[in-house]
Amino acid sequence: MLFLKEEKIIDKENVIGSNIRRIRLEKGIGQTELIRDLQLRKIAITRETLVKIEGGRQHIKLDQLKAIKDI
């Protein structure tokens, strides 16, 4: 893992994205529900962004990762 100035985390092996998906599914939380909870916490994220993060096509921001951890 490597941190950039913009507080995005580079995850070349998509460990973070795949773990977010796995844990989300284990908890029975849908993407829409997770996005709603994050937006209520003032985290700027869309369902499209979550799909890209889980699929390894977009880097996650540090504030997004911290908020997901708390759900």
Regions of interest found by a model, annotated:
Residues 20, 31, 47, 62-65:
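Helix-turn-helix DNA-binding elements, focusing on the entry/boundary residues of the two helices
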Residues 2-27:
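A short, Lys/Arg-rich alpha-helix, primarily the initiator
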Residues 28-53:
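Short alpha-helical DNA-recognition segment
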Residues 23, 53-56:
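Heptad-repeat coiled-coil/leucine-zipper interface motif in alpha-helices
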Residues 16, 27, 43, 58-61:
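Flexible coil/turn residues that form the inter-helical turn or adjacent wing/linker of helix-turn-helix
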Residues 57, 61-71:
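DNA major-groove recognition helix of helix-turn-helix/homeodomain DNA-binding modules
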